Amino acid sequence: MSAERVTFTADGLTLVGNLAVAAGGAPAVVLTGPFTGVKEQVVGTYAARLHERGLTTLAFDHRGFGESGGRRAHEDSQGKLADLRAAVGLLAGHPDVDAGRVAAVGICLGGGYAVRAAATDPRIRAVVG
């Protein structure tokens, strides 16, 4: 999978992700993972498999983890929701993404975050948690 390193912000913090764009305006998926997970671990594996199946994927480090800014190793549930909304914004605003076909996939603890984000962000059209 060929992914581009991207940066975006949430609450003034810089977040870092890996964006793999599929051809032809394919649906897009943002992935969120386990408690202390980073984009190179389980969410990166899921992203690679989904991209192989023709989806645009964004795996990113939440605030305080991996390459992203913020207080190190601090679990901030409201902050993670803001991070997800910002990630959805990045996807929805990308010229090669159909903003009406953005989904969220949450793995482990990320499942709860994905469902909560989808409940409050109408740009998320499908969710797997």
Locations of the language-model features?
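Glycine-rich phosphate-binding loops of nucleotide-dependent enzymes
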Residues: 5, 33, 53, 102-104, ...
